[in-house]
């Protein structure tokens, strides 16, 4: 390609510290000219990726300046016409990692919904979104390799491992980095529960039981409340906030 796309927040001092208004710039290697293609948007514009056929560019975009927890949307632009489109409207959550499909007609992305980060397929013909994976775990990062997607997967009971995911959702574990350790441990059951809040809404909570839990016995309880509140309590694995250790 004769063009390079990059993201930058061209501000200094206090304005740089409090603003989230970054933009996508395209530098032409032949003319040495730089063009801002997201100047009208006032929030974060990040992670530009060209389509395999070179006809489009996709990027993540937040709408409002100074609001770093804004909805992370997915946009594409037709490089010939300059037409831009908000393509992830059908997914009412953040678009996290994403990658173009080989045919440039599909974008695969990860996103959290109901406490799980799954892999989704976005059909650019009609902007419809379909979940490829399901289950009580999180996928993070996604790359295309042939006819499969390569991604990290973890849960509250397992640290990161690498998986190959077929486009029909069939996942094959490629790494077993901690198998010897897991074989010596017994993990407690993890259960999702929906609770009605004081304002009448439904809230997802996670219950992590001790290993060898006996329902006839009483156990001390620890309540973990997520701070931020810029991230959900999904099926994340943490060496600092490890729920299996807390439950044990």
Where are these regions (language model features)?
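Conserved beta-strand positions that form and line the central face of beta-propeller blades
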Residues: 35-37, 86-87, 118, 131-132, ...
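Serine-hydrolase catalytic core recognition
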Residues: 140-248
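Short loop/turn segments that connect beta-strands within beta-propeller blades
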Residues: 28-32, 78-82, 123-127, 166-169
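A flexible loop/linker signature enriched in serine peptidases of the S9 family
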Residues: 1, 8-23, 36-49, 58-75, ...
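Residue-level detector of Asp-centered blade-edge/turn motifs that repeat once per structural unit
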Residues: 52-53, 102-103, 144-146
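Hydrophobic beta-strand positions that form the internal "hydrophobic ladder"
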Residues: 4-5, 54-57, 106-107, 149-150
